Amino acid sequence: QRVMIAMATVCRPRLMIADEPTTALDVTVQAQVLKLLKHINQKYGMTIVLISHDLSVISQICDRVVVMYAGRIAEAAPTQVIMTAPAHEYTKGLINSLPSMERKGSDLPCIPGHVPSTEEKREPCPFAPRCALADDICRQQEPPRRMI
């Protein structure tokens, strides 16, 4: 990972896209990679688009988060807002399923249902079939975008 990051930064681009840069790394190496990315961002002013399914990694390094579900933006906000006051039920489910010391030894909550395949017909809100708060409006029209 570090070699790839070095190769990606040698020409000092203004943007780096890091797709799952910490996947399959042990926590020590993961911390080193995150520290390196943070250093590159701060020293060179390089924008880093971090693509990850790991919210604990995202919360350590990102200023803003865009949560996607079934190819659509579910929510976008500053990281602190996403982590402390998520607005979308999918984001809430992701955060609730993070391991924590308070729940040590207990099963992690999971989001019921399944992620739709690309062939499945989707509701205007693709999360509606899995959402406990979904009502008719969720199945009839796409939720409006609003600033958070």
Label the model's feature ranges.
Residues 6, 39, 55, 115, ...:
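Short, flexible, glycine/charge-rich loop motifs used to bind or transfer phosphoryl groups or to couple energy/partner
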